[in-house]
């Protein structure tokens, strides 16, 4: 679960981390009032969405009057922001963060994630702040500095000082960076976070450090013991198809292609998407119905896939182990009849009761295309999508 920037900064402030004075608003009038409350003669207005790239998409603006802040709010509230991290429809804008301006000397990066290989929280820092850190890691990995946190003793000041020296900080900045580092580590552990990022962590003209941005991702599995953070969830930022899928314990991620995929097992689902791509197709989604698939869940999976208007064909790839292929076939038949599927459906069944499942599909009288192998299935579904403009 993601938090908005303004929510992340509220948490930062509670842990004593330096953040800009700001106000989250949801009306144009409140935007003008926020400028008065903050004071000064210039402010930064930032739309609040769960996506990066806001600045390049016009969602961040320096405003120099109350009226300019109000106009920015009028232009964005209730609209959708499209960035390189969103789909073509973008994310809805329900709030805008108005902040005091900051005079920036340098931009750094500081973040932490759970490293699955070491099973520890790992902090990452870089002199390349304010840019896409994944790009920095790919192009200049030597610029990514790391510190692994021992779960028995927690984050240590010496680790912070080591990173600070290597970032080129000096004097009182070392103490400030250590305070931020220890505070983020404490925040991470006490709130069951999966990721926290300060990008950029800036050195101001006066030499002091400031957390200019806040990105927080919570471990969804731990939300039951974080009721306060759970209440911060903004459902407007969720894809309604993914919300629907979660209710049926389906793992669904929307993509940009036109071939719907329904598979049991995450590994097989990724392999299916790869082979569809290999044969010139573009998957419209990742959908894992899981090992405990039922007729009802298969029906709901079809509804979710077909709610995407871009889908021109559907590939069902099932390996029967725990789940029986005949039960999946029954679900497919019921779903096609109930939903009224209008696009070609290619089905490949293998494993437990696969032959029985194939017979049921053949006897159904429905326009379902059988496939004998995964390659055959990929070739057929790509052709079907191309033939269905």
UniProtKB/Swiss-Prot annotation:
Q: What does this protein do?
A: Succinyl-CoA synthetase functions in the citric acid cycle (TCA), coupling the hydrolysis of succinyl-CoA to the synthesis of either ATP or GTP and thus represents the only step of substrate-level phosphorylation in the TCA. The beta subunit provides nucleotide specificity of the enzyme and binds the substrate succinate, while the binding sites for coenzyme A and phosphate are found in the alpha subunit.
Quaternary context? Heterotetramer of two alpha and two beta subunits.
Positions that bind substrate: 264, 321-323
What name goes with this protein? Succinate--CoA ligase [ADP-forming] subunit beta
An annotated GO cellular component? succinate-CoA ligase complex
The catalytic activity, as recorded, is: succinate + ATP + CoA = succinyl-CoA + ADP + phosphate; GTP + succinate + CoA = succinyl-CoA + GDP + phosphate
Q: Which UniProt keywords apply?
A: ATP-binding, Ligase, Magnesium, Metal-binding, Nucleotide-binding, Tricarboxylic acid cycle
Keyword Ubl conjugation listed? The answer is no
What cofactor is this protein dependent on? Mg(2+)
Q: How is the cofactor bound?
A: Binds 1 Mg(2+) ion per subunit.
Per the UniProt record, the source organism is Azotobacter vinelandii (strain DJ / ATCC BAA-1303)
Concerning InterPro entries, the annotation shows: ATP-grasp (IPR011761), ATP-grasp_succ-CoA_synth-type (IPR013650), ATP_grasp_subdomain_1 (IPR013815), Succ-CoA_synthase_bsu_CS (IPR017866), SUCC_ACL_C (IPR005811), Succ_CoA_ligase-like_bsu (IPR005809), Succinyl-CoA_synth-like (IPR016102)
Q: What is the lineage of its organism?
A: Bacteria, Pseudomonadati, Pseudomonadota, Gammaproteobacteria, Pseudomonadales
Q: Which family, according to UniProt?
A: Belongs to the succinate/malate CoA ligase beta subunit family.
EC annotation?
Answer: 6.2.1.5
One GO BP: tricarboxylic acid cycle
Indicate which residues the UniProt annotation says bind Mg(2+). 199, 213
């Amino acid at each position: 679960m993601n938090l908005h920037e303004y929510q992340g900064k509220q948490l930062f402030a509670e842990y004593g981390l330096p953040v800009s004075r700001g106000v989250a608003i949801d009306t144009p009038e409140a935007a003008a009032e926020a400028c008065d409350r903050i004071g000064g003669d210039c402010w930064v207005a930032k739309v609040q969405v769960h996506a990066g790239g806001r600045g390049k998409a016009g969602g961040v603006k320096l405003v120099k009057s109350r009226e300019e802040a109000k106009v920015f709010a009028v232009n964005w509230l209730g609209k959708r922001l499209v960035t390189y991290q969103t789909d073509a429809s973008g994310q809805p804008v329900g709030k805008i963060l108005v902040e005091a301006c900051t005079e920036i000397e340098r931009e750094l990066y500081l973040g932490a994630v759970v490293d699955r290989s070491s099973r520890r929280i790992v902090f990452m820092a870089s002199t390349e702040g304010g840019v896409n850190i994944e790009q920095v890691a790919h192009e200049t990995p030597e610029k990514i500095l790391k510190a692994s946190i021992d779960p028995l003793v927690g984050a240590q000041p010496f680790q912070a000082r080591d990173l600070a020296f290597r970032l080129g900080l000096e004097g009182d900045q070392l103490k400030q960076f250590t305070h931020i580092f220890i505070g983020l580590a404490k925040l991470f552990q006490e709130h069951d976070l999966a990721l926290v990022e300060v990008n950029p962590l800036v050195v101001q003209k006066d030499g002091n450090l400031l957390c200019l941005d806040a990105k927080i991702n919570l471990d969804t599995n731990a939300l039951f013991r974080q009721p306060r953070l759970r209440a911060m969830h903004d459902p407007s930022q969720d894809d309604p198809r993914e919300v629907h899928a979660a209710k049926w314990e389906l793992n669904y991620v929307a993509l940009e292609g036109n071939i719907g995929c329904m598979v049991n097992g995450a590994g097989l689902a990724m392999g299916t998407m790869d082979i569809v791509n290999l044969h010139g197709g573009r998957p419209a989604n990742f959908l894992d119905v899981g090992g405990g698939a039922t007729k009802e869940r298969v029906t709901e999976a079809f509804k979710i896939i077909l709610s995407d208007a871009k889908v021109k064909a559907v590939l069902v790839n099932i390996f029967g182990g725990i789940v029986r292929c005949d039960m999946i076939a029954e679900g497919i038949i019921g779903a096609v009849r109930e939903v009224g599927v209008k696009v070609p459906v290619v089905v490949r069944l293998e494993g437990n009761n696969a032959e029985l499942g194939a017979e049921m599909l053949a006897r159904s009288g429905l326009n379902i295309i059988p496939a004998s192998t995964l390659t055959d299935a990929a070739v057929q579904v790509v052709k079907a999508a191309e033939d269905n403009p």
